[in-house]
Regions:
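Thiamine diphosphate
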Residues: 1-136
């Protein structure tokens, strides 16, 4: 995971948005809509939620086995840090995929995903249905 774009300088509320793959277009669309309301956005790209989870679990295990040493912080926690800023993760997958990093995200964490099956339509219509389009984000 990496910071794709930092929040613009200024006052007002801020939110952290995490996207991955093709859904990043929807995240960028949401940024424009949020800016119209005076909300600044940091944009992160998650290249692999599975790898982030494995790394987080490895840090947790190391900390458990070495209680007298300085604790290791998982990459997600290092990158997102501040619990004051809400985080929204958006995925074309089931919500369970980005939810794999929940335990290392401090503060309010919302996951938007495509839970469900048996749907057939255009990508735009499906993203609207599952509420993962730019407007819903």
């Amino acid at each position: 995971m990496y910071l794709l774009r930092g929040a613009p300088k200024g006052d007002g509320p801020i939110v952290r948005l995490i996207g991955s793959g093709p859904i990043m277009v929807q995240v960028l669309d949401a940024v424009e809509k949020l800016e119209a309301y005076g909300i600044r956005s940091e944009i992160y790209s998650a290249t692999s939620y599975g790898e982030l989870r494995r790394e987080g679990l490895a840090c947790d295990r190391w900390n458990r086995l070495h209680p007298s040493k300085t604790a290791k912080k998982p990459w997600v926690e290092q990158l997102l840090g501040n619990a004051e800023v809400p985080v929204v993760a958006v995925s074309d997958n089931m919500a369970a995929v980005p939810d794999m990093i929940r335990q290392w995200v401090r503060g309010h964490f919302t996951v938007l995903g495509t839970d469900g099956f048996g749907r057939s339509d255009t990508r735009e219509a499906l993203r609207r249905f599952f509420e993962i389009d730019g407007k819903a984000v």
